[in-house]
Amino acid sequence: MIGAMIRVQGLRKHFGDSQILKGIDFEVPPQTVLGVIGASGSGKSTLLRCLNGLETIDGGTIECGHVRLEAGLSHHDYRKRVRELRLKVGTVFQHFYLFPHLSVLGNIIEAPVHVLRTPRNTAQTEAYELLESVGLKVAARRYPGSLSGGEQQRVAIARALAMHPALLLLDEPTSALDPRRINSLRTLLRTFVDRGHTMIIISHSMGFLGGVADHILFMDGGHVVEHGPAEQVLNSPQDARTKEFLEQAE
């Protein structure tokens, strides 16, 4: 895995007779952002759910750190690898899924305390540091229902980072944000990348990805059609299907 934080090779996924992912190959270098684009139904969301172990893969491999998830393992070994993978991969879902009965601080320390067995005092100290990083330290004792959508998203990012993931996945992070909040999110994510984090972001916002992603991967029909530097793919796509998609997305 030298030179890659995550490497995906020959990834396949089907639901019944429907092939959703048809041999996906890519890798993401450390401390970079990969933006994944494509029309609805192209396989983006299924890819994300495979990367964090929410969907069982039917072919190929996913490697992150020393964890190698592959099709064909016994049920016991596969579930064991999935548990290991989830400790490496954090996810910020489109709808955040914060616990409404827990405070902001409680949401962030829940997994470190109960999954990683981090001492509560240590987890709280780290949580306050993360909240300060996302500009919400003063909201530590508030509850999710009292927060705006943008604030809830920042809590979700802090919660994911509290598990010290090697890779952070973000699903449509701009879907509920106004332009000012989108610019703020772009700056926040690049700050975390500069601090050493690696990310994969699924988004329909080309403008957002143009300011945050290092590389872009375009999917169509369950295939990787084009993958390259963000500026090249977004401004000078090499494949006609990528060009058509970008023209329609404008």
Set out the residue ranges of the language-model regions:
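Conserved ABC ATPase "signature" region
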Residues: R68-A71, R120-A139
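Catalytic Walker B motif of ABC-type/P-loop ATPase nucleotide-binding domains
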Residues: L168-D171
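A short, surface-exposed alpha-helical micro-motif characterized by mixed small hydrophobic
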Residues: L209-G211
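A short, proline-enriched helix->beta-strand linker immediately N-terminal to the Walker B motif
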Residues: A162-A166
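Conserved ABC ATPase signature
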Residues: Y143-L147, E151
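Helix-to-loop junction immediately C-terminal to a conserved catalytic motif
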Residues: N52
